[in-house]
Amino acid sequence: MVLAMESRVAPEIPGLIQPGNVTQDLKMMVCKLLNSPKPTKTFPGSQPVSFQHSDVEEKLLAHDYYVCEKTDGLRVLMFIVINPVTGEQGCFMIDRENNYYLVNGFRFPRLPQKKKEELLETLQDGTLLDGELVIQTNPMTKLQELRYLMFDCLAINGRCLTQSPTSSRLAHLGKEFFKPYFDLRAAYPNRCTTFPFKISMKHMDFSYQLVKVAKSLDKLPHLSDGLIFTPVKAPYTAGGKDSLLLKWKPEQENTVDFKLILDIPMVEDPSLPKDDRNRWYYNYDVKPVFSLYVWQGGADVNSRLKHFDQPFDRKEFEILERTYRKFAELSVSDEEWQNLKNLEQPLNGRIVECAKNQETGAWEMLRFRDDKLNGNHTSVVQKVLESINDSVSLEDLEEIVGDIKRCWDERRANMAGGSGRPLPSQSQNATLSTSKPVHSQPPSNDKEPKYVDEDDWSD
């Protein structure tokens, strides 16, 4: 558990969380940008569903899909807007709790119409991106760096793209956002020294290349825990589950987020008077019971405890059980308990990501998820358990690659009328299969796909 926690530390957003009134104004802007009737109270990003055996026939064989690695980082949207009062461009990151963080230091230009000097004269306004904030290991310096990997675009310069197919959204992302950003860094590096982190487009492959992508996961400069299958022609589902958007994980990577509650034993000191408040005290030398609670829905009024030595009292438990119920116990060894104590951090009430041990069936902790206010809803937990029981292995996926390619070719031939002409989705995908700023090269056939800009590492 301890080693897993150290390697799975989630990155922190390098920004300032915005107060309620500012956040509300920003939510209204996003609402109007996405043509929503009213501001959503939840994260406006789409949510994938867990991969099941039935998805092979019903989805992967029936529709064109992209496949990419599933980054194990921090899912955030990036909202870029010009302040109507000051005229200054602001960059905000939206986490899964729908908090808005102001990230200073960036400048995002529009695509120049005639000359490169326009990169210094024009600014993005009303652009909403989807991606993952991740900690990467620089292969040159071996130092850890923060990077934002973009994989979708909900709006570009005030134009809502959610009803456009994925292929079109990615084309807009590459041409109208990433290219001018990349060109600005290349042409005017002295103007980019304040950028708090680097940005890349996540590499997309056709679904029949899933084996190549899966076998590249351990070669990436960041943690990855599976694959994402995105339908080529589907619109973007903002603020909810997308039944066509699939996440595949190896069985051992299927995880659940629980609320952690510690039952710390109390002992009596008979040497103290019976009316002494210190006669009974918590015994931290004895390992407590680690209970995992699953969220039933509703607002969680319990806040994470500020002090380690203040477990939940009876009243707090009563409040907790309005929205949570005990699901299981966490397996913690004596050594792991000592390591947790050495952290000198609050433990009670924190959200923890856990995996089920395939051999023992015990739940083991991977990391704290302080980016989440609640654990997974009970319905999500049920889906994850079903996914574990109905797990699709990489070997299972390898066996259907030929069928996926055959179905692709049949659809391509049917839409082209047998003329052999490439489909629009094919040519559009080709513009996105390279992380270079020139978006006209065909998908790479390299054994190790390029997920980031290699010339980006040295600066």
Curated annotation (Swiss-Prot):
Result of altering residue 95 to A: Temperature-sensitive
GO cellular component: mRNA capping enzyme complex; nucleus
Active site: 70 (n6-gmp-lysine intermediate)
GO MF annotation, one: mRNA guanylyltransferase activity
Region feature (Disordered): 415-459
pH dependence: Optimum pH is 7.0.
Pfam families, A to Z: mRNA_cap_C (PF03919), mRNA_cap_enzyme (PF01331)
Biased composition (Polar residues): 424-444
Main location, first listed in the record: nucleus
Role: Second step of mRNA capping. Transfer of the GMP moiety of GTP to the 5'-diphosphate terminus of RNA via a covalent enzyme-GMP reaction intermediate.
Further comment: Present with 279 molecules/cell in log phase SD medium.
The protein's name: mRNA-capping enzyme subunit alpha
Organism per entry: Saccharomyces cerevisiae (strain ATCC 204508 / S288c) (Baker's yeast)
Name of the encoding gene: CEG1
